[in-house]
Amino acid sequence: MATRHQVRNAVVSLLYAKEMGSEMNDFVSEYLEEKRIRNDQRKFADKLFNGVCKNVNQIDNELDKYLNEYKISQIGTVERAILRLGAYEIMYEAIDKAIIINEAIELAKELAGESSPKFINGVLDRIGKVK
């Protein structure tokens, strides 16, 4: 059974694939099955992925407020996916913000550039303080 961290990792990968223009209809189901994300964890993955996709404009507007000299469109694709997922969970889910931010930092360490964890921590921490 997949952990929530593994689910979030898969959701970041799906958000990345969507951003890169992949056809998502069958891909989401196939990818989650390949990663052995099933049952309750599958529902959690679907909720996160669909929630980010449905609310991406509001999420991006919120992120833009805290990116200082950047816009969300200027951020690397992997970092953007991690930020969107973290911001979605802070804005729309009743999960401890410290857990969400820590998960995002861990995802950045695994998937993104060397300076990304600190950057992602700073942005999500600022969002978490006002939400």
UniProtKB/Swiss-Prot annotation:
Keywords: RNA-binding, Transcription, Transcription antitermination, Transcription regulation. It comes from the Bacteria. The keyword Transcription regulation applies. GO terms for biological process: DNA-templated transcription termination; transcription antitermination. SUPFAM superfamilies: NusB-like. GO terms for molecular function: RNA binding. One of its GO terms (cellular component) is cytosol. InterPro entries: NusB-like_sf, NusB_fam, NusB_RsmB_TIM44. Belongs to the NusB family. Involved in transcription antitermination. Required for transcription of ribosomal RNA (rRNA) genes. Binds specifically to the boxA antiterminator sequence of the ribosomal RNA (rrn) operons. PANTHER family: ANTITERMINATION NUSB DOMAIN-CONTAINING PROTEIN, N UTILIZATION SUBSTANCE PROTEIN B-RELATED. This is Transcription antitermination protein NusB. It comes from Campylobacter hominis (strain ATCC BAA-381 / DSM 21671 / CCUG 45161 / LMG 19568 / NCTC 13146 / CH001A).
